[in-house]
Amino acid sequence: MERYGISVQLKHIPVLDPEFMPMLQFNRAFLETATVPVSLAVERADGQVAATHTKIHGTPEMAEADRYYIDRLVKTELWMKGGYKIYINNKELYDYLKSEYCAEGGRAFDWEFMADVFEKPFEVVYTENIPETLDKPQPMGGHLDGCRIGFDAGGSDRKVSAVIDGETVFSEEVVWLPKINPDPEYHYEGIVSALKAAAAHMPRVDAVGVSSAGIYINNRTMKASLFLKVPKDLYEEKVKDIFIRAIRDTFGDVPYAVANDGDVSALAGTMSLGDNNVLGIAMGTSEAVGYVDANGQITGWLNELAFVPVDANPNAMVDEWSGDIGCGVKYFCQDGVNKLAPRAGIELDESASPAEKLKVTQKLMEQDDPRAAKVYESIGVYLGHTLAYYYEKYGFRYVLLLGRVMSGKGGDLLLATCRKVLDEEYPEHADKIQLKLPDEKFRRVGQSMAAASLPKSK
């Protein structure tokens, strides 16, 4: 199998996607023949930096491969860790990245998205002085003392818990429709209503923790699908500080923390496992990811792995939102199942929703249909190759696999296939990675209780 003059040999190929080329295998083969040093760095909030020192070929015949390798590397760093400024010490690659990361370039989506998230113009900088890596992880979570509120803001329901010294004394779920509502007062009132409902069951409120889908920097809502329909001017004015305002208006000056729901899932994993260094991957509507490091801290990385490239196949499926190809969202969520099902001979109603399409394959899998088995085996191969790639970036000990794609017999087959690929393709990593499905203890902790543990009380 060859891409851009780089040849890769695989033991495990997805039966329904024979052109799949794992990013890690491409990178390894590329670096075997690369000899010219190049350094780059991506800067994000609070002066944090992710630096990479690597090599390229630097020859005219390998120029396309060099550009592709650097493009995928920068994209990975941007969506894994976040950033608004790229530093690079190679003039040709600087010119290339500058032409891509602009309003008219191939990475216009990433350029605009990151500028919005970090509230700074996106820049590409040529320099010989590449800044070194600097992380400022936040100690967050695992605090169960006192009277706490945990709020989990979902896209179709919101859940709140009142927790006293680690015991949940009240919990409620309320259906709401945040994604279709353009008025941020609707969201604000829903949040305050939930907070007050929990507070009524405790003598006082010592701390409030919030879990929600989206990107949160310093507790501020920088991007979130809950507020999809809110106009941009109102978003700036009313949404970015919405959780902070709701908590302060209701309880005054209490400690609070707002975190991405993926990070809170990983935190719930650490609480149920009694150990740290957990990557949580929820395969549902999208690929939602969170990470708690070896010290039990949330890293401040974006962990938006749905946008991280996993496949070097130039004909990989396009993600409609970002316009890019070969990224996690088309492999590790219901889109991945629905992409492969027709290739296995499973007929799907094109007018059905993605969730309804997924149910067709799941139902066939429960009946041991061999077509459905091919779908889950193929995703298991994707995942085995990709977890080895993620491992080299994170160094996690546990992977917690969540979401509707992982449920039932399909999830079991996916997991077994993934384990086999790790064992046979990546023996140097396999014994260091423990794959986990959510157990009863994890469900007992739950998202809202883990959220309640986020802030340290006074």
Indicate residue ranges for each PLM-predicted region.
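C-terminal region/appendage detector
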Residues: M1-I88, R107, W111, V205, ...
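Glycine/GP-enriched mid-protein hinge/lid loop-to-helix segment characteristic of carbohydrate kinases
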Residues: M1-T52, A65, G106-A108, L134-M140, ...
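Glycine-rich phosphate-binding loop and adjoining helix at the ATP-binding site
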Residues: G58-D71, K75-K81, E92, Y96-T127, ...
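Short glycine-rich phosphate-binding loop at a beta-alpha junction
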Residues: M80-N90, R204-A213, Y394-V405
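Short glycine-aspartate micro-motif
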Residues: K85-Y87, G146-D152, V205-G209, V278-A282, ...
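Structured, charged N-terminal subsegments at the starts of enzyme catalytic cores
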Residues: H143-C147, A153-E173, N181-P184, Y188-V192
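Short, well-ordered amphipathic alpha-helical segments that serve as non-catalytic structural scaffolds
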Residues: E185-H201, Y382, T386
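Phosphate/ATP-binding catalytic cores across multiple sugar-kinase/actin-like superfamilies
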Residues: S378-F396, L454
